[in-house]
Amino acid sequence: MDHVPPPQQMFQHVTAYWVTQLMGTAARLGLADCLEAGPLRVAEIATTVGANADALYRVMRACTAVGVFTEQADKTFANNALSQTLRSNVPGSMRNFAIAQSAPGHWRPWEQLTEAVRSGKSTAHAALGHELFE
């Protein structure tokens, strides 16, 4: 196993939320479901899911960079073993989990973690406008 330098490790930790948001976006748009029948060009995917083709291409490339989806020639993408978990109609689907974990109700309270540690109080109300369990 190659040694990953500490700055690179920290970069991966600090930017991990980017991946969560990528997975949530892929799940919400139904990208893996769109590719269920086989590879498609990004323009076709964009039309099917109602997205801007240029923006979607950047998202698909970012997903590919973290091992989700496979990019082929001519801006064509296909599912792989990891993206299959974002399909809605497969056993063990993680699609709804990706949507939930990337939703504001899950990540906004984390924005207030420093204040919660300082005060010892829940910051859910400040982050969400209500307590988590009312």
Predicted segments with their positions:
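Conserved Class I S-adenosyl-L-methionine-dependent methyltransferase catalytic core
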Residues: V4-G50, D54-E134
